[in-house]
Swiss-Prot record:
Activated by phosphorylation. Its cofactor is Mg(2+). The keyword Transmembrane does not apply. One of its GO terms (molecular function) is phosphoglucosamine mutase activity. The lineage of its organism: Bacteria, Pseudomonadati, Pseudomonadota, Gammaproteobacteria, Pasteurellales. One of its GO terms (biological process) is UDP-N-acetylglucosamine biosynthetic process. This is Phosphoglucosamine mutase. Keywords: Isomerase, Magnesium, Metal-binding, Phosphoprotein. It comes from the Bacteria. Gene3D superfamilies: Alpha-D-Glucose-1,6-Bisphosphate, subunit A, domain 3, Alpha-D-phosphohexomutase, C-terminal domain. CDD domains: GlmM. The active site is at S102.
Length: 444
């Protein structure tokens, strides 16, 4: 794979107004993508965004670039990332574009692309777009310029799609649900989905103003959700991130239920109903208790690198349909082609209704092991993880933890840092083990 200049693991991302998230660059990105994608046929590209104020500027720039390349843009307005994956498929579009920086603050933004199949663009297509960006920009003749249109019923279409994944014979009419939409793209989706399935819904984080996305709310900050669940005596709390591809839950006691526990609940339910195809993909950061709980059920488990892109790649490699991260990206591949917070929450709610069990009862099978994380800074040069002394200490700790825990040592890709992670049933042993390894790293 060629070295990337602009595309990271999740498209092009950065601070608004700083290269490359500038109007002129994004216009050219729209043009370059249009030139590469225009070979497909339908001539239309879907553009969705989250609720950041910069989304207006960036969608206009993309539209101009696409039009110059001869492609038409169809705008959905604020829409979750997984909704764009779904709508791109149903509209038979050349591609889908999402303007979002996910869980980042409002002053960041990004551009990511979906293929006509609703999956991330293949590497060779991203590389072709990067190569096109190096060419001088031109414009098709006037008669071939693209147009712009708006899909007025995009939200309704996606709401119906989400509801179609919930068993028709079940209802949420006995449930009180607090929904936190992070003042992001699910603000007009998730509350309506839950209400239309019968739930009593209490909303927080559903008043976007362009600048309050992810601010003290959503999947990355659940304190307000926990308080509201307890205050209103709700059955469950749901927290999405700014673009709706992550889910974190809160039980009726106010306890956090993370992505590992959510993944287990969905996997066990799929196994019971005979819909689990193969096993489950987690990441290097997935809690060991998830692995052990799945093992007890006879469900295979493999770890991918951190990042939903890598989870999906591993799922495709094994031809499995379920994967996710502890951060709350949950991919149910027979329902959508990317992580989908709303659909993941419906899968858990269906299990609650079906078995008349609380979220707390469903999640109790995965008692998360304490994780201790220590970041150790080192002087540039040799990688301390290659030192014999560090390897010896790591091996000794692994023997002590045998079967009861695990260690993960990683060098940061962006800073001179070694990340030491120790996970163990015994919190004190985890802390002592992590400090022992960190000390060995510092001494080398």
């Amino acid at each position: 794979m060629a070295e990337r200049k602009y595309f990271g693991t999740d498209g092009v991302r950065g601070k608004v107004g700083s290269y490359p998230i500038t109007p002129d660059f994004v216009l050219k990105l729209g043009w370059a993508a249009g030139k590469v994608l225009a070979t497909q046929g339908t001539g239309k590209v879907l553009i969705g965004k989250d609720t950041r104020i910069s989304g207006y500027m960036l969608e206009s720039a993309l539209e101009a670039g696409l039009a110059a390349a001869g492609l038409s843009a169809a705008f959905t307005g604020p829409m979750p990332t997984p909704a764009i994956a779904y709508l791109t498929r149903t509209f038979r579009s050349e591609a889908g574009i999402v303007i979002s920086a996910s869980h980042n603050p409002f002053y960041d933004n990004g551009i990511k692309f979906f293929s006509a199949q609703g999956t991330k663009l293949p590497d060779d297509v991203e590389e072709a777009i990067e190569a096109m960006l190096e060419q001088p920009m031109d414009c098709v003749e006037s008669a071939k310029l693209g147009r712009a249109s708006r899909i007025n019923d995009a939200a309704g279409r996606y709401i119906e799609f989400c509801k179609s994944t919930f068993p028709a014979h079940l209802s949420l009419d006995k449930y009180k649900i607090v929904v936190d939409c992070a003042n992001g793209a699910t603000y007009h989706i998730a509350p309506n989905v839950m209400r239309e399935l019968g739930a009593e819904v209490i909303e927080i984080g559903t008043q976007p103003d362009g600048m309050n996305i992810n601010e003290n709310c959503g999947a990355t900050d659940i304190k307000a959700l926990q308080n509201k669940v307890l205050e209103t005596k709700a059955d469950i709390g749901l927290a999405y991130d700014g673009d709706g591809d992550r889910l974190i839950m809160v039980d009726h006691f106010g306890n956090k239920v993370d992505g590992d526990q959510i993944l287990f609940i969905i996997a066990r339910e799929a196994l019971r109903s005979g819909n689990l195809k193969g096993g489950v993909v987690g990441t290097l950061m997935s809690n060991m208790s998830l692995e052990l709980a799945l093992k007890q059920l006879g469900i295979p488990f493999v770890r991918a690198n951190v990042g939903d892109r890598y989870v999906l790649e591993k799922m495709q490699e094994y031809n499995w349909i379920l994967g996710g991260e502890n951060s709350g990206h949950i991919i149910i591949a027979d329902k959508n082609t990317t992580g989908d917070g709303v659909i993941a929450s419906l899968a858990v709610l269906a299990a609650m209704v079906q078995h008349k069990l609380s979220l707390n009862e469903l999640a109790s099978a995965v008692k998360l092991f304490p994780q201790v994380l220590i970041n150790v800074r080192f002087a540039g040069g040799a990688n301390p993880l290659e030192s014999d002394a560090v390897k010896a200490v790591a091996t000794e700790v692994e023997k002590q933890l045998a079967g009861k825990g695990r260690i993960l040592l990683r060098k940061s890709g962006t800073e001179p840092l070694i990340r030491v992670m120790v996970e163990c049933e015994d919190a004190e042993l985890a802390q002592l083990s992590a400090e022992k390894i960190a000390e060995a790293v510092r001494s080398n």
